[in-house]
From Swiss-Prot:
Molecular functions per Gene Ontology: GTP binding; GTPase activity; magnesium ion binding
Cofactor(s) required for function per UniProt: Mg(2+)
Annotated GTP binding sites: 166-173, 191-195, 212-215, 282-285, 311-313
Oligomeric form and interacting partners: Monomer.
Protein name in UniProt: GTPase Obg
Span of domain OCT: 347-424
Subcellular location: Cytoplasm
Domain Obg: 1-159
One Pfam family named in its UniProt record: GTP1_OBG
Length: 424
């Protein structure tokens, strides 16, 4: 299966259904009154962590996800049906990010954990809701609220106990294959591994998940080589096994290799160099490996790290390496995953309301997000709806703002080229 660990998708919550305008008309009921029902709520957009998924491949082919709209209200005070919620399945370990602001919306690290990212628009009220002792036959209803929309970025960070790090061709994939049933592509050239591989290691009655991270090079923290594409997969690991080609088969100095990789980890995220780390001096089956190992061991121990001479190819030294790995993992306190909320509810920041006023004679031209928001639920062509709009203008403080500019009763208000005289 193709491994995809990033995606950018468009999501939209469902629109609320419109309120309905109707009047009860039945024999022997001469004054039936309004009976228009409310519109249904739009569907939410909900992400759910599915343990059966391991890649974001599906989002390569489909990038727009829109929840169902609520149904319009009906006569006889019947409410419209709510829109179906839209569930989007992602692998466990997926981070959902607001693409515009970079804000982390949710981090789904527990199987079946949910994140309600966008809530559906509210249904509009039917005309029955607007009946008052002074307005017995309202001939208007509210339009449904539009569902919010946004672009989000999905980033998958693998959930593994142990991360294998090192230069390309150091032998990480061979080590993973020797320790587990994973079968990563193995060849004698750099960057054979282009995607992370996971394997379950079973050793002396214990088991853990090991991740083979594609080889790093100098500048990886800046995105060079495979860079940021895969460094993030180390973030969730509990410890690192630093695999070094101690034979220097690529013409590099093993000690310098060790230093450079740790520096890249530090530059990417300081926390990574604080993770428990042991060093696997690989390719001890080669004469050059045996020759260079004593100096390498001395230098690495000076830096405070434990070194284990191994051959990933012949499996020499693997028992001691895995014994130490299990010892370290057993000493790390288990994460309190039960404290992770089952459902995350995201509340996107509200857009700042704006009101623009242009005065020409006794006509006041209004525009801006504040007016747009009020108009979403108004039918300006209906007299009763227009009266309700005037009430909203007062309640929202727009009329007070106009009075500061000299507005008075009898002046004209213009919104979207529709004009009406306002009287108090």
């Amino acid at each position: 299966m193709v491994f995809i660990d990033t995606a950018r998708i468009y999501i939209k919550a469902g629109d609320g259904g419109n309120g309905f305008i109707s009047f009860r008309r039945e024999k022997y009921v001469p004054y039936g009154g309004p009976d228009g029902g409310d519109g249904g709520k739009g569907g939410d957009v909900i992400f759910i962590a599915d343990p059966n998924l391991s890649t974001l491949l599906d989002f390569k082919y489909k990038r727009k996800y829109i929840a169902e709209n609520g149904e319009n209200g009906k006569s006889k005070n019947q409410y419209g049906k709510d829109g179906e919620d839209l569930y989007i399945k992602v692998p466990v370990g997926t981070t959902i990010i607001n693409d515009e602001t970079g804000e982390v919306i949710a981090d789904l690290i527990k199987p079946y954990q949910k994140a309600i990212v966008l809530k559906g628009g509210k249904g509009g009220r039917g005309n029955a809701k607007f009946a008052t002792p002074t307005l017995k036959t309202p001939r208007f209803a509210e339009s449904g609220e539009k569902g919010r929309e946004m672009w989000v970025r999905l980033e998958l960070k693998l959930l593994a106990d142990v991360g294998l790090v090192g230069f390309p061709n150091a032998g990480k994939s061979t080590l993973l294959a020797s320790c587990s049933r994973a079968r990563p592509k193995i060849a004698n050239y750099p960057f054979t591994t282009l995607t992370p591989n996971l394997g379950v290691v079973e050793h002396k009655g214990k088991s853990f998940v090991m991740a083979d991270i594609p080889g790093l090079i100098e500048g990886a923290h800046r995105g060079e080589g495979l860079g940021h594409d895969f460094l993030r997969h180390i973030e969730r690991t509990k410890m690192l096994i630093h695999v070094v080609d101690v034979s220097g088969s690529e013409g590099r100095d093993p000690v310098e290799d060790f230093e450079k990789i740790n520096e890249e980890l530090r530059l990417y995220d300081e926390r990574l160099v604080t993770l428990p780390q042991i060093v696997a001096a690989n390719k001890m089956d080669l004469p050059e490996g045996k020759e260079k190992y004593p100096r390498f061991e001395e230098e690495i121990k000076k830096r405070g790290y434990e070194v284990y001479p191994i051959s990933a190819l012949t499996k020499e030294g693997l028992d001691a390496l895995l014994d130490k790995t299990i010892e370290i993992l057993s000493s790390i306190p288990a994460e309190k995953i039960e404290e992770v909320p089952e459902v995350i509810v995201y509340n996107p920041p509200e857009e700042e309301e704006t009101l623009e006023v242009e005065v020409k004679g006794n006509t006041y031209y209004l525009k801006g997000s504040k007016i747009d928001k009020l108009l979403k639920r108004i039918n300006l062509q209906d007299e009763h709806s227009l009266r309700y709009f005037e009430i909203l203008l007062r309640k929202s403080g727009v009329i007070d703002a106009l009075k500061e500019k000299g507005f008075k009763s009898g002046d004209v208000i213009n919104v979207r080229d529709f004009e009406f005289e306002y009287y108090e």
